[in-house]
C-alpha cells in the first residue's frame, strides 16, 4: 500500500504540529507501509530520519489554491497512490484514490469576517463540503467539532 500524506502545511501552527506528530509516531509504529510525503520544495529532506519507507515528493501547488485542485490529483496518479491523507479540510474532488481527511474545526466558517472576502468564504465552504462528502473517513478532535462539521456539511 502506498499512502500519501499532504505535508505542505508542515510549518503552520496547529496543522503543522499535527503533521509533525503524525509523521513521528507513524515512523515508530509502521516500518512496512510506503509513505509519500507531499511537501514544498524547501521541505524535500522531510523524510530523512523517518525510515526507509518514507519518501518526500515535491508538490509545488500552494495549499488552498485553485492549482492544487488539478496538480495534486495529477501527482497522485503519477505516484500510483493507494490512499491520501489530507490533514486539513481541502480534498480536491478529482483525487483518483481513496482518501481520509482531518477536519480540526470550522472556525473559518463560523467567523467569516476574518476571511479576506466572500469568495474566500465560498471557496472554504465548498472545499469543506467536498472533503466531508468525498472522504472515506473524517478525523476530528472533539464532539463539538463533529457537530460543527455536520452543521456545515
Language-model segment annotations:
Residues 1-153:
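Carbohydrate transferase catalytic cores enriched for Leloir-type hexosyltransferases
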